[in-house]
Amino acid sequence: NMVVYKRRKKDSILPSTVIASISYTQKSQIIFPFQSVIYLRHNRAMLISDWRFLKYPSITYGLGMHSNPANENLLDFQYLKFHESILFQLAPNVYAGGGYSLDYFWKVREAFPHVTPVTDFEKYGYMGHTLSSGLMFHLLRDTRDNPINAYSGTFANISINPRLKFLGSDANWNTLRLEWRGYFRFPASSSNIVALWSYNWFTLGGRPPYLMLPSTGWDKSYNTGRGYIQGRFRSNNMLDGEAEYRIRLTKNGLLGMVLFGNLESFSEINTYRFESAAPAGGLGLRIKLNKYSRTNISIDYGWGRQGSRGFFVNLGEIF
């Protein structure tokens, strides 16, 4: 479920959002997320929460862009995530702050161990459990007219997340995330929107656990790389760019459609070099659930390289 909270219609406080659900899939996965962005003190501060529990048997395909879909490897694991940050307003629409992150994986195992050839998971370093504990530092600027379904504005975020042994982490390592989104009416007189998204995820130092490496569909909303299954590509650095053309089909906005394309690249695990990229594209349907918050259901079908394809469903816009 998604809840959007704004105290009064003319209230200057930005809308807060809370997303919580629990689901059980046909692949015996249990997914329990709680995510929220709460604005405090007349927009002078914001509290960002991202808590999750996953029991998540899922497929990985190896490391780098040259991984083969035929070499799928089923991993089973349980995952507890606790990320909590508070940001303070520096200027209109600009916030900076920090917080704490905990990522704990346990009961990590291959469904079919000791197969030949040896999997990239085993080569990288098999670990049955990992603990990553550290600090987070954020700088963001958000001029979107609506954080759930923007018609105009931009969003930019820089996030640095060092994991530190003195906070209980198994090892010292560091990640950097750079994100930008933009929304523009096109044509200017229409209600159609061009939406752009850049999501980039880098390992700055150290050696993250295998399941904490940048990977397709493992962004905060599990949405990067439509056209490819989650976990299709994985390595130490990731570049992802996406574009959508959002078309209103009915005057009241109940129905809409989307044409989308994306391009992502992952560095080679040993050289850190980007050598190739994976394009994908597709189209989708939008069904409006709430005209005030603009919440909708997104149902997309995407195609990627090497025969990759599938449906992708989301509550709210993809980005």
Give residue spans per PLM region.
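Hydrophobic, lipid-facing positions within transmembrane beta-strands of outer-membrane proteins
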Residues: 30-34, 78-84, 133-137, 141, ...
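Short glycine/threonine-rich loop-to-helix capping motif typified by GTGT followed
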Residues: 171, 269-273, 311
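Outer-membrane beta-barrel channels and translocator barrels
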Residues: 5-7, 41-43, 89-93, 144, ...
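Transmembrane beta-barrel strands of outer-membrane/channel proteins
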Residues: 18-24, 49-57, 62-65, 98-104, ...
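C-terminal outer-membrane beta-barrel translocator/porin domains of Gram-negative envelope proteins
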Residues: 125, 135-250, 255
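Sequence/structural signature of outer-membrane beta-barrel proteins
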Residues: 3-7, 21-27, 54-58, 105-107, ...
